[in-house]
Amino acid sequence: MLALAVSSLMAPWTAGAQPAPSAKGAPVIKEVRFGVLPLGGTVESRALWTPLMADMSRALGLPVSAYSVPSYEELDRAIGRDEIDMAFLSAKMALDAVMQRRMKVVAQIARRDGMPEHRAVLLARKVGPLHTLEGLLAQPERWRLARGDSRSVTGFVVPQSQLFLPNQIEMETRFRSEFVGTHQATALAVANGDADVATNNTTDFERFRQQFPVEAARLQVIWESEPPPGAPMVVRRDYPPEFQAKLQGFLVGYGKGKGTRADAEREVLKDLRAAYGYVAADDSALLPEAKLEYQLGRQRALSAAWVNDAAREQRLQRIEKAYAAQVEALKASSASR
């Protein structure tokens, strides 16, 4: 874990310390540990969020530190160990954390009509043996795949559910080889000839174009998905409602004012690919991701080999029951607001 305090003007505190319980049982918040999704390297991912964390620290009157890790798996484990107080997560990771009752959604990126939509993509080299989507789907065993972690919506879940499984292709087993990494790492793998095709998304590929123009010029998009569920901002569920409301107010108001400070905040948001800032949200924002996971589960069950039809039907019934429970829990959050 790489922790970085972005405000040294606050009262002394211990990096990574667990919040102490108050007399009423709720944690006493002495710092905010912000979980950072791995975009490229840990230092790069952390640096992108540092300006917003510094402003958050001033607004909340608390030190804010970045918990930056190299993989989705490590970030997931940190959430499970209560080492993270808030985070910007993939919809898949957020759904898992919310259903485990560890986190709750407080905000998500604002979208407006006419702005470019965030989509999953597949990348291949412009000059190379693989040129088309048809060639990929016809003989997946010929090609080396670079993909995201299974917790990544655009790096795994969406390509699997919208493209590969409908064509009877399991990403994990049908390709000649596979490399799992960040969106930056998968794009570099194809650009440098270490893989033939990579999962990615429009937002991170645009960032890749700016950071690696030479390598990006070697790549082409051969498939684009429908818009996937958005990534939300989550906070620990056991934190006091007053703190959650203050944090949500900061996020929703960030970059919305006038003057030099608001102008600077809007520049920060542009770097984070959130040009229009954040809007208030609750756990019901994860309903699209729950539906996507449900569809993926059904696709896998229907395409798998079973000892008999009854076994398949039992699996499908369990998937239906789990999805119904998720929907009920996520809708309950919206109703209680």
Regions found by a protein language model. Give the residues of each.
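N-terminal export leaders
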Residues: M1-L2
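An extracytoplasmic/periplasmic, membrane-proximal ligand-sensing/linker region
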Residues: I29-K30, G40-G41, A47, P51, ...
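Immediate post-signal peptide segment of exported/extracytoplasmic ligand-binding proteins
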Residues: G16-V36, L136-R144, A324-S336
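Extracytoplasmic small-molecule ligand-binding "clamshell" domains
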Residues: P19-L95
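Periplasmic-binding protein-like
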Residues: R33-P38, R111-V121, P213-Q248, R266-D283
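Short helices/loops that flank or line small-molecule/ion binding pockets
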Residues: E73-A87, Q100, H118, H183-A198
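Pocket-lining segment of extracytoplasmic ligand-binding domains
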Residues: Q139-A146, S150-F250
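Bilobed "Venus flytrap"/periplasmic-binding protein-like clamshell domains
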Residues: I29, R33-S57, V69, M115-L188
